[in-house]
UniProtKB/Swiss-Prot annotation:
Subunit of dynactin, a multiprotein complex part of a tripartite complex with dynein and a adapter, such as BICDL1, BICD2 or HOOK3. The dynactin complex is built around ACTR1A/ACTB filament and consists of an actin-related filament composed of a shoulder domain, a pointed end and a barbed end. Its length is defined by its flexible shoulder domain. The soulder is composed of 2 DCTN1 subunits, 4 DCTN2 and 2 DCTN3. The 4 DCNT2 (via N-terminus) bind the ACTR1A filament and act as molecular rulers to determine the length. The pointed end is important for binding dynein-dynactin cargo adapters. SUPFAM superfamilies: Trimeric LpxA-like enzymes. Belongs to the dynactin subunits 5/6 family. Dynactin subunit 5 subfamily. The modification N-acetylmethionine is found at M1. Part of the dynactin complex that activates the molecular motor dynein for ultra-processive transport along microtubules. Keywords: Acetylation, Centromere, Chromosome, Cytoplasm, Cytoskeleton, Kinetochore. This is Dynactin subunit 5. GO terms for biological process: aorta development; coronary vasculature development; ventricular septum development. The keyword Acetylation applies. It comes from the Eukaryota. One of its GO terms (cellular component) is nuclear membrane. It is found in: Cytoplasm, Cytoskeleton; Chromosome, Centromere, Kinetochore.
């Protein structure tokens, strides 16, 4: 399926020197602790909580509308500690997701309306289907598909998943154009 052009109003997005496109309607708390490595798209009404701990996002990632990215935490007898969140390259996070993972590898697709529980680890080349709720501290192995509530193994991905995700995220970035450039 060929992706059509996705047009956006240039005044509604900030484009950084490294090619990141961040919606002015998104909320980046503690922006000094948020690292976007380049050509990443953060769409409207997203929230990234860099005020809690460092958040690193790789290259060619897409975070769609109304998603929340926040670092994981652990409760101790003396309080709560937050830990850094690392997201790899070529990761696609659909609309209305809440991500509270410890780590998301590269070439990962998270479907619409998902909840990624506290301190989950999503390895490289995995897929989370729409409406999935992963319980805290779940580990999703490479080349697997998880779905349901609670999220459980439901299938495998082909060996070419890495190439497919590179293709999807790069083409999405190339087709995400300002209205004036058409």
């Amino acid at each position: 399926m060929e992706l059509g052009e996705l047009l956006y109003n240039k005044s509604e997005y900030i484009e950084t020197a490294s090619g990141n496109k961040v919606s002015r309607q998104s909320v980046l708390c503690g922006s000094q602790n948020i690292v976007l490595n380049g050509k990443t798209i953060i769409m409207n009404d997203c929230i990234i909580r860099g005020d809690l701990a460092n958040v690193r996002v790789g290259r060619h990632c897409v975070v769609k509308s109304r998603s929340v990215i926040r670092p994981p935490f652990k409760k101790f007898s003396k309080g709560v500690a937050f830990f850094p969140l690392h997201i790899g390259d070529h990761v696609f996070i659909e609309e209305d997701c809440v991500v509270n993972a410890a780590q998301i590898g590269s070439y990962v697709h998270v479907g619409k309306n998902c909840v990624i529980g506290r301190r989950c680890v999503l390895k490289d080349c995995c897929k989370i289907l729409d409406n999935t709720v992963l319980p805290p501290e779940t580990v999703v192995p490479p080349f697997t598909v998880f779905s349901g509530c609670p999220g459980l193994f439901s299938g495998e991905l082909p060996e070419c998943t890495q190439e497919l995700m590179i293709d999807v995220t790069k083409s999405y970035y190339q087709k995400f154009l300002p209205l004036t450039q058409v």
